[in-house]
Each structure stands twice: as C-alpha cells, then as structure tokens.
C-alpha cells in the first residue's frame, strides 16, 4: 500500500543563479526523446524532472527507468507519479538494449520505480535488462540504480549481483532523522545493509550512493552519513541540491552554496571514497560515463599503491 504524500502546498522558491540551467533544445535532444518514445521507454530524466536533462539528452545520454513510470511509494522529494503500476513489459529489456545500441552508449544507467506489488520487487527485470545489454551491446558498461526491494532485499540482491553489473547504485537520499517525513516508505539502515551486501557478495562491483542536501539536515549529520557509507565500503558518493518538484512536495530548507559542496567533497575524499561528485546540480547519473572511467582509474591506482608497499 502506498504511503500518503506529505502535502505542503509550499510555493516553489526562486533558485539562486548557480542552480539555473538552460532550457532543453536542439536536434540531439529531440532525437533522444523520439527514440525513447518509439521504444516505449520511460526515463528518470523526464519523470523526476531532472535539471540536467537538456545537457544529458543533447549528448545522447539518458537514464532509462524500467518497470514502468508509476511508483508504489510516495516519497516527499520525488516527482515520479504514484499509483498502481501496469504489468511488467516483457519486451522492455530488449528495448533498453536496442536504445543503448542505437545511441552508441559506452555506459548506461538503468533505474526503476519501486514495485512493492511484485513478488521479487522487480529484481528479475533488472537481471533481464543486464542480460539483454550484454548480448546486444557487450562493450557498454552497466550501472544500475535500484530501489531497496523492501522485505525482498536478500533474494533480490543475490539475483542482481549474480548478473554482474559494473556499478550498483542505491541512494540513501537523506540523513536518518529526516526519513519519517522525506522517505517514509524506506529504512535508512536497510538501505545501508543493501549496499554492504552487494560489496560482500562481489567486491569487484563498484558501489555508489547519493544524498540530497537542502532538506534541513545538519552538517554533522551529513558527515555521519559519509562515515556510515564508508563502513559499508561504498566506493562513490554523489551529493546534490534538493529542488522542490511541485508545491505538493517537501519545501527546500536552504540552497547550499557551491563552496559548502566543495567542503563536503574534501571531507568525503579524506574519509576514503574512491570518487566523490558534490555540486549543486550533481545527480546520481549525471556524467555517469565519465565518472565510471574515473572510478575504474582510481581503483587501479589504489591497487597499484597497495602492491608497491612491501609486506611487513
């Protein structure tokens, strides 16, 4: 059963200059949109009203959202529609692979809505998408951004990890104190355990997680989330500014200045993340392809450093 969406009716605040982006336009943008329509694919870029859609789609980058466009939950920060989803589309995995091939993607990000109505939470569809991508465009690296799978997490994670995506992303979204109002359908430590389990099952898979700031969190709370992530051996941290999608969603508590993001990034790097992306416009899949290359290079550099240290 869906949780009720907190009704705030808070008017959207005027964004500072560092948040503003150009309106999407251009032939490449139009071509990407047309391709997604033709293959009957949803994208989180559109459904979540991502501010970077113009830049990404112009570069023919898109984050595909599988399992439909309707979520069984109603988080206070998310613009994806809530309700009873349609049945799973058996053709969707191949359509995702066809889109990746047609766009010539070197790296693809695949996410989904929450599907609490399904016995496996949608895990089998993630596996089928990964398998279709490996068959159709084997050189494309695969990043998945999954939900928490609620009470089905153990079986779901084992199934997906066995399919061997290159990056497993699951966002913590915010600090634990704000979960009851911002992410009421989820549990902070369950999400943390999910990522810890991925790394335990297959240490070669990169793990990634992100949080939003500007929801009323304290800096020390953000630092604690970083520590929790490192305890779970998460490789890559993303941080971005929360933006209120509609007046019905949670209000922006504050617009975090770029210098504060720089400070957060420096602290995160000192805590041992392989890679950190922290800017007002950072989103989970923003520059994901370039970041995957950096992530791989950072791991190789770390392994080389360890190999160079003589055994005690």
From Swiss-Prot:
Please give the catalytic activity noted in the UniProt record: [[Fe-S] cluster scaffold protein carrying a second [4Fe-4S](2+) cluster] + N(6)-octanoyl-L-lysyl-[protein] + 2 oxidized [2Fe-2S]-[ferredoxin] + 2 S-adenosyl-L-methionine + 4 H(+) = [[Fe-S] cluster scaffold protein] + N(6)-[(R)-dihydrolipoyl]-L-lysyl-[protein] + 4 Fe(3+) + 2 hydrogen sulfide + 2 5'-deoxyadenosine + 2 L-methionine + 2 reduced [2Fe-2S]-[ferredoxin]
* Domain Radical SAM core, chain residue ranges per copy: 57-274
By its UniProt entry, which Pfam families does this protein fall under? LIAS_N, Radical_SAM
Carries keyword Metal-binding?
yes
**What terms describe the molecular function in GO for this protein?**
4 iron, 4 sulfur cluster binding; lipoate synthase activity; metal ion binding
Q: Where in the cell is it found?
A: Cytoplasm
Q: What is its main location?
A: cytoplasm
- Cite the annotated pathway: Protein modification; protein lipoylation via endogenous pathway; protein N(6)-(lipoyl)lysine from octanoyl-[acyl-carrier-protein]: step 2/2
This enzyme's EC code(s)? 2.8.1.8
- Note on cofactor: Binds 2 [4Fe-4S] clusters per subunit. One cluster is coordinated with 3 cysteines and an exchangeable S-adenosyl-L-methionine.
Q: Which cofactor is essential here?
A: [4Fe-4S] cluster
Keyword field: 4Fe-4S, Cytoplasm, Iron, Iron-sulfur, Metal-binding, S-adenosyl-L-methionine, Transferase
User: What general EC class does the enzyme of this chain belong to?
Assistant: transferase
- One Gene Ontology term, aspect cellular component: cytoplasm
The residues listed in the UniProt record as binding [4Fe-4S] cluster 1, with positions renumbered to this chain, are 45, 50, 56, 285
Listed binding positions for [4Fe-4S] cluster 2 are 71, 75, 78
Q: Does the keyword Lipid metabolism apply?
A: no
Which NCBIfam families does its entry note?
lipA (TIGR00510), PRK05481.1 (NF004019), PRK12928.1 (NF009544)
Q: Of which family is this protein a member? A: Belongs to the radical SAM superfamily. Lipoyl synthase family.
Identification of the protein by name:
Lipoyl synthase
Gene behind this protein: lipA
């Amino acid at each position: 059963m869906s949780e009720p969406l907190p009704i705030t009716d808070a008017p959207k605040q005027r964004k500072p200059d560092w948040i503003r982006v150009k309106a999407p336009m251009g032939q490449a943008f139009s071509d990407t949109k047309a391709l997604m329509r033709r293959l009957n694919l949803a994208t989180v870029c559109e459904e979540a009203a991502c501010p970077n859609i113009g830049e990404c789609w112009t570069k023919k980058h898109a984050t595909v959202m599988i399992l439909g466009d309707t979520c069984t939950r109603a988080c206070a920060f998310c613009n994806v529609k809530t309700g009873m989803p349609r049945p799973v589309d058996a053709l969707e995995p191949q359509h995702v692979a066809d889109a990746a091939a047609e766009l010539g993607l070197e790296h693809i990000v695949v996410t989904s809505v929450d599907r609490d109505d399904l016995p496996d939470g949608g895990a089998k569809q993630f596996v089928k998408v990964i398998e279709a991508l490996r068959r159709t465009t084997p050189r494309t690296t695969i990043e998945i951004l999954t939900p928490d799978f609620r009470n089905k997490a153990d079986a779901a994670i084992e199934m997906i990890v066995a399919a061997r995506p290159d990056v497993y992303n699951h966002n913590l979204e915010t600090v634990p104190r704000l979960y009851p109002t911002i992410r009421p359908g989820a549990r902070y430590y369950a999400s943390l355990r999910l990522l810890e389990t991925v790394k335990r099952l297959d240490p070669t898979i990169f793990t990634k997680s992100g949080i939003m700031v500007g929801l009323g969190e304290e800096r020390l709370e953000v630092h604690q989330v970083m520590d929790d992530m490192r305890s779970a051996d998460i490789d890559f941290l993303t941080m971005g500014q929360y933006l209120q999608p509609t007046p019905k969603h949670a209000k922006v508590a504050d617009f975090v200045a770029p210098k504060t993001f720089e400070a957060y990034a420096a602290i995160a790097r000192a805590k041992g993340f392989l890679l950190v992306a922290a800017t007002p416009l950072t989103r989970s899949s923003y520059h994901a392809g370039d970041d995957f290359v950096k992530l791989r290079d950072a791991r190789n550099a770390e392994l080389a450093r360890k190999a160079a240290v003589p055994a005690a």
